[in-house]
């Protein structure tokens, strides 16, 4: 029903943001609400989920995120909350690359995704996803992610930093770069 909403971020919550558009406030569940800034004017690509007479808006900064979300919820056993959690923990290109390579182990790192769900995702989506923005090795960024977690950084901060890294560098250099960004 709603393809996108243009508006200003008014409130940021743990799992969602509130956007005001033409005097109407929309609560939109988003993978990484803390990546938004209060007062920021933007376009959020949305999906309206209807279940048991409850309307829930899910929103994404990029069309690619929304497209992957829609494909994930088409998989048996994966609902909007699980798909949102997957997108909150990994980038679109890393997830797509893992699915296309059949890497079930990588997919089980996402909250609520066990081996059975990971295999179902691969079965249903392998070969149907196009990896556009990320051509590097997703395993390198996965190692950086794990290293930052081990150093005590939280998931939200890590997810803000990973897209800023140059995946062509070595793992050690990427960790140094990530730490430099995080300490600014």
Question: In which residue ranges do the predicted regions lie?
Answer:
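Structure-specific DNA junction-binding interface
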Residues: 1-74, 179-184
């Amino acid at each position: 029903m709603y393809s996108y909403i243009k508006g200003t971020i008014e409130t940021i919550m743990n799992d969602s943001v509130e956007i005001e558009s033409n005097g109407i406030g929309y609560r939109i569940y988003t993978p990484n609400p803390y990546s938004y800034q209060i007062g920021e004017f933007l376009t959020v690509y949305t999906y309206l989920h209807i279940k048991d007479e409850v309307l829930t808006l899910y929103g994404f900064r990029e069309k690619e995120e929304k497209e992957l979300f829609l494909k994930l919820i088409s998989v048996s056993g994966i609902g909007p909350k699980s798909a949102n959690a997957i997108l909150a923990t990994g980038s679109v290109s890393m997830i797509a690359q893992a699915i296309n390579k059949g890497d079930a182990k990588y997919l089980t790192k996402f909250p609520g995704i066990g081996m059975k769900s990971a295999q179902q995702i691969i079965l249903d989506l392998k070969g149907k996803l196009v990896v556009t923005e990320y051509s590097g090795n997703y395993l390198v960024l996965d190692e950086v992610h794990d290293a930052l977690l081990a150093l005590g950084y939280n998931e939200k901060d890590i997810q803000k930093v990973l897209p800023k890294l140059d995946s062509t560098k070595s793992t050690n250099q990427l960790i140094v770069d990530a730490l430099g960004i995080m300490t600014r």
